[in-house]
Amino acid sequence: MNRALQCPPWGSRSRTPATSQFSGSNRSQQWPSSRLIAAEKANTANSVSGPDYALSTANIYFASQPGQSLYGLVTLAPLNPNAAFGDPTTFGTDNDPMVGKAIGGIVVFGGGLALYSGKGQILGGLGVSGDTSCTDHVIAWKLRHELKLDAVPMGPSPEHNDNMILDIRNGVSPSGFGHPTCKGGQPAEPIIRTLSRRFPTGPKS
């Protein structure tokens, strides 16, 4: 079993969260910070993906490091405090203060994916937080597939989609879009390597 503690918000193409949800019986079972991290992951994946090419938040980990092509990205879209904070009893509900507001924020580790219709139209982003970033990526991938919002047109992975690329060795990512392996918890890396085969992306008939 591979699971995350925090269920995902997903946002529209206008970068406003459409919903915020938590897993478990109550919000106290979640990491409090995961609510915002998940929303920022959705915002990031939506912001860096387009109609012809998708980048997951995992794909931009190495690219955002000093000396790489996206260095400085994390400073470009600060978190919107008016959307992030409010009555904590509404967090993870339809009345969450972030719903319908531009949340902002950029996250450059796994758990955020762009959403595409069956015809390949980009619709927004999905973010999951609450476990290792590798497990968050797996949960987001499986959920996107279940929702049938994974008609990814192209991406940087060897399978030509936005799957996590685990190619960082000695601080270097040959692809330029690598993500480190994750420590702690149930290892997700073997699952990640089979996601494209078990839960394929691409245009749907």
Language model: regions and residue ranges:
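Flexible, solvent-exposed loop/hinge segments and secondary-structure transition points
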Residues: M1-S205
